[in-house]
Amino acid sequence: MARKNRTPEENARREKIRELLQMANIDSMDDIQTLFKEAIAEFMEKGLEAELDEELGYSKYDYKNKDTDNSRNGHSSKRLRTSFGEVDVSVPRDRKGEFEPQVLKKNQTSISQDIEEKILSMYAKGMTTGDIETHIQEIYGISVSDSTVSRITDKILPVAREWQQRPLESIYAVVFLDAIHYHVRSEGQIVKKAVYIAIGVNLDGRKDVLGMWVGENESAKFWATVLNSLKNRGIEDIFIACTDNLTGFDAAIHATFPQTEIQNCIIHQLRNSSKYVSYKDLKALMADLKAVYAAVDEQAALDALDAFEERWDKKYPKISQSWRANWANLSTFFKYPQEVRRLIYTTNAIEGFNRQLRKVTKAKSVFPTDDSLLKMLYLAMMDITKKWTGRRQDWSLIHAQMAIYFAERMPE
């Protein structure tokens, strides 16, 4: 069986693991087991410190926010039995002796393998505050407050920001750009914010979320900021960008990546076209539009658009006007073979991802802060993209076709 080609991110992660193993002098399974025990101890200690922060109402050394006559009083050591062996955990104390930790109760001397797996899973996935609280209470009988869980899950934010700033590949065959909207509290008001999302397909045909940015309502100006961020992280060229037809979007793209070809999403255009069409006309009108975007080539598509005008312009003149006004970016896909056309003529790749995000976030009608929104989206993204392990089935053919159309820009 041929060895699987790893992505640059997988190779980078493997390199970090190799460095960690070398730094920790890991050369046996016993050493690996010790490393796992230390990881569990580190996680437990972080959770305990976060709980004590919540109990006292201020973080360590944050004396200006201290509003209690209680204080920290060093640490005690507790030995736990785990499936990896015994682990020593440093438990923080308060001077009054009122601190009752819930992550690791005072009389608790062991944690089962199931709890260990759940702790590591929750730490990696960052379940919502309420979900974690309910899960721990119902399954393990441990009660924790919303704010304690929030403090613990907030540990993921630096990880999310590091991910957002990670280096990217120099060339992407296709990048899909779209926004999804949420309500967030800001200065005492509930405001609608856009989360700008970029998904790239690299030259190996592998899909990856390049970034997610929380900003104001969708605008070409903010997209320009997003595109500059992508460039600063290492992207030098994008062959094709797939977008909606937001005003000024193409100018924002070309200001950063002047050679990039733009394909407006046909599905977005169809939605806009059908928005004010009478129900009794809808089926016939959409069939005539299909003759435009499903044509064998651009000339046939223009002929079909002429026929559409003759039939529908008296009743719905703005539809054909919109198609003609946006034709330069709607018709890009006609120059390519069918395999490339299917890849780029809609933004289904990113819309499918957005649907999965909405499933995760649908119970949350309003987010308290931008950070709480980013945290949940990052954790949902990590879970969704676990399944993105392979490349497109027809990628070898697509790559060969792109090597012809983008010969001067394709690396050797």
Predicted region positions:
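Basic, short loop/linker segments at the boundary and entry of helix-turn-helix/winged-helix-like folds
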Residues: D67-K125, G141-S150, D154, S170, ...
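Conserved phosphate/pyrophosphate-binding and hydrolysis machinery centered on Walker-type P-loop NTPases
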Residues: T7-E10, N25, M29, Q33-E42, ...
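Short, conserved DNA-binding cores of transcription-related domains
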Residues: M1-K106
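Conserved beta-strand -> loop -> alpha-helix junction used to position metal-binding or nucleic-acid-contacting
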Residues: I240-T247, A252-D288
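RNase H-like nuclease fold core
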Residues: E86, S90-R95, V103-Q108, I142, ...
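Electropositive nucleic-acid engagement tracts
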Residues: S59-D67, M127-V174
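Acidic/histidine-rich catalytic cores and adjacent linkers
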Residues: R3, P258, A291-E412
